Amino acid sequence: MADERSGKGEDSGKLLYCSFCGKSQHEVRKLIAGPSVFICDECVDLCNDIIREEIQEATTSDSSDRLPTPHEIKETLDDYVIGQTRAKLALAVAVYNHYKRLRYEDKKGEVELGKSNILLIGPTGSGKTLLAETLARLLNVPFTIADATTLTEAGYVGEDVENIIQKLLQKCDYDVEKAQKGIVYIDEIDKISRKSDNPSITRDVSGEGVQQALLKLIEGTVASVPPQGGRKHPQQEFLQVDTSNILFICGGAFAGLEKIIRDRAEKGSIGFSAVVKSQLSSKSVGETLKDVETEDLIKFGLIPEFVGRLPVIATLDELDEAALIQILTQPRNALTKQYSKLFEMESVEVDFREDALRSIAKKAMERKTGARGLRSILEQVLLKTMYDIPSEQDVCKVVIDEGVIAGESEPIKIYKNSEQAKLAADE
């Protein structure tokens, strides 16, 4: 039998076996011969997987050894998010200090450094989520988005706060070590504000109750998370995840917060240096939000303990027409570049005229949806064209002007070797 396994019986027609897994030549697709040894295709695949994993781990550790500086973090954010300089600076410094703190603690330093979680305040579509996503991609750490409106206190219908950590674990294939250095973005945090200043007999399970549940998670605790989530398999051994090194970024529009800030400023303005009321009301929402203080957030409905866990507050400005046009054209993932690429795959060039871009920006401002509304406008405008183009072989260019955005005309299609189409394009 030993002779058969080593392949000595090759000439005599005896069965050949893989020297590694012991499978016969009939059990595998291919058996590769070497000097007195054989290896099957399955073992070759396994070896490739092992080598690939080791290379990937080595590359990841090399890339994560160097922490990007605040300047480099801001430059990367500039590639994807237009404007919002103040928020970018605050995020760059906070994130840099957070991961610097992790490295310092790994070396068992004498001074204990606190965690700087972040609160982003800004209108819908101003770039809060995109900033958090870009940070996670740059730092190559696990990232998850949680919706605060779906969270409830433990024991009530809805998601428990531990589900947030569950989602983070899923992003890194349940690697606890990686998850403990991840970033969690909790969206719509303003929607879990306390419903009223007065304590109520009925429990506020989706408002103040959620804030209380999030307190320890954000500050740092050891959360018990089942490997496959939920409570369906109580016999499973729970994973212990320490959240003290997870960076939490909370974001919300905080509609009405600017009024609370103005009211506070008016009450405090007495004497010769007082700010005139008309000056306060003439300030934009973005400018007013710059002056936000802890007491304003507490009056809005966040409990003091929760606000205390979010020491870094960054406010984002409303996007004006010029900023929306820049968003359409400048970032790496600009919508005009994305649609141009889609048309390019059909060997068609797409030309967005300047007046069309202005018209798209105006429409988005009217809808009050910020940058998020730009894609839906473009999808609506280009739907019929994207439906027709794959079936039309001779189209070489599509021109989008102001009339197309307003719904007054169809996109101009320029055909190969068509004089009429060329004249139409010139007009």
UniProtKB/Swiss-Prot annotation:
NCBIfam families: clpX, PRK05342.1
HAMAP family in alphabetical order: ClpX
Family per similarity comment: Belongs to the ClpX chaperone family.
Superkingdom of the source species: Bacteria
Keywords: ATP-binding, Chaperone, Metal-binding, Nucleotide-binding, Zinc
Gene name, Swiss-Prot/TrEMBL: clpX
Annotated GO biological process: cell division; proteolysis involved in protein catabolic process
Subunit structure: Component of the ClpX-ClpP complex. Forms a hexameric ring that, in the presence of ATP, binds to fourteen ClpP subunits assembled into a disk-like structure with a central cavity, resembling the structure of eukaryotic proteasomes.
Any one GO MF annotation of this record: zinc ion binding
PROSITE patterns in the cross-refs: CLPX_ZB
Disulfide feature: none
General function of this protein: ATP-dependent specificity component of the Clp protease. It directs the protease to specific substrates. Can perform chaperone functions in the absence of ClpP.
Name of protein: ATP-dependent Clp protease ATP-binding subunit ClpX
SMART domains: AAA, ClpB_D2-small, zf-C4_ClpX
CC per GO annotation: HslUV protease complex
Domain annotation ClpX-type ZB: ranges: 6-59
Species of the source: Hahella chejuensis (strain KCTC 2396)
Keyword Chaperone (UniProt): yes
Residues that coordinate or bind Zn(2+): 18, 21, 40, 43
Binding site for ATP: 123-130
